[in-house]
């Protein structure tokens, strides 16, 4: 099943954490979940964010406000001159939701080690009619050179304008999808071409994560309860 499920969802609480962090009752849960999906869709549609190379959007709900943490490889594009763009983004989201919104930016230092950014880069080049084999080879080379231990890229659609759609895959290194302690990042993107859409999936393996290397905000793991020590009965002295 490791080959079928989403690698991030399979590792939640082990070495991955949730992108949305809040608590709600059964009555409000569905509405808040739908609101999170709308927030992420709005961010992708805002002109200031389309070319910002956004890797992840975290949503943290407080009693009085919503904090949106945007992970991007190009923070200057989102912030803008003297913070004009980030204020505009916050105003647009706040107007549509009717709630107080706080936008925070977190820079992604190494874009080659984030699967979402690799998928977006491949999709962008495919939309520009680049040779898909050359694009896949270059993406794998850049990722492995940056320190990854393995990468797998799969694209599907009318590749090169062919009449029949097909799937092509390229892999470098090892990607152990069945190993739960493996740090595997997953990303997906779509390339809009004149022939139709081409889907891009990326699996990126960065190494093993053991107990002491887990992220601080990851879900709490169950700890083994210590067994109470049983005291040995004192031996009676010889009379």
From Swiss-Prot:
One Gene Ontology term, aspect cellular component: cytosolic small ribosomal subunit
Record Gene3D superfamilies: 3.30.300.20, Ribosomal protein S3, C-terminal domain
Domain KH type-2: 39-109
Keyword Aminoacyl-tRNA synthetase among record annotations: no
Protein name: Small ribosomal subunit protein uS3
Any one GO molecular-function label of the UniProt entry: structural constituent of ribosome
SUPFAM superfamilies: Prokaryotic type KH domain (KH-domain type II), Ribosomal protein S3 C-terminal domain
Source superkingdom: Bacteria
Free-text function comment from the UniProt entry: Binds the lower part of the 30S subunit head. Binds mRNA in the 70S ribosome, positioning it for translation.
Record NCBIfam families: rpsC_bact
GO biological process, one term: translation
Cleaved signal peptide residues: none
Protein family (similarity comment): Belongs to the universal ribosomal protein uS3 family.
Region feature Disordered, mapped onto this chain: 219-239
Subunit field text: Part of the 30S ribosomal subunit. Forms a tight complex with proteins S10 and S14.
Entry keyword set: Ribonucleoprotein, Ribosomal protein, RNA-binding, rRNA-binding
Entries under Pfam families matching the protein: KH_2 (PF07650), Ribosomal_S3_C (PF00189)
């Amino acid at each position: 099943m490791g080959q079928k499920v989403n690698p991030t969802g399979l590792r939640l609480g082990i070495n991955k954490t949730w992108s949305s962090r809040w608590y709600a009752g059964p009555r409000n849960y569905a509405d808040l979940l739908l609101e999170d999906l709308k927030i992420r869709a709005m961010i992708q549609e805002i002109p200031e964010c389309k070319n910002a190379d956004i890797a992840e959007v975290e949503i943290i709900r407080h009693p009085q406000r919503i904090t949106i943490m945007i992970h991007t490889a190009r923070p200057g594009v989102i912030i803008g001159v003297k913070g004009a763009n980030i204020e505009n983004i916050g105003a647009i989201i706040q107007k549509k939701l009717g709630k107080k919104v706080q936008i925070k930016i977190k820079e992604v230092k190494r874009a080659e080690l984030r699967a979402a950014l690799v998928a977006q880069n491949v999709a962008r080049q495919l939309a520009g009619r680049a040779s898909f084999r050359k694009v896949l080879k270059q993406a794998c080379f850049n990722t492995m050179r940056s320190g990854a231990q393995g990468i797998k890229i799969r694209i599907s659609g009318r590749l090169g304008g062919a009449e029949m759609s097909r799937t092509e895959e390229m892999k470098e290194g090892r990607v152990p999808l069945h190993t739960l302690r493996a740090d595997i990042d997953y990303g997906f993107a779509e390339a809009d071409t004149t022939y139709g859409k081409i889907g891009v999936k990326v699996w990126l393996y960065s190494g093993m994560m053991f107990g002491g290397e887990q992220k601080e905000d990851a879900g709490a793991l169950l700890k083994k309860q210590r067994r109470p020590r049983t005291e040995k009965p004192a031996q009676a002295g010889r009379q």
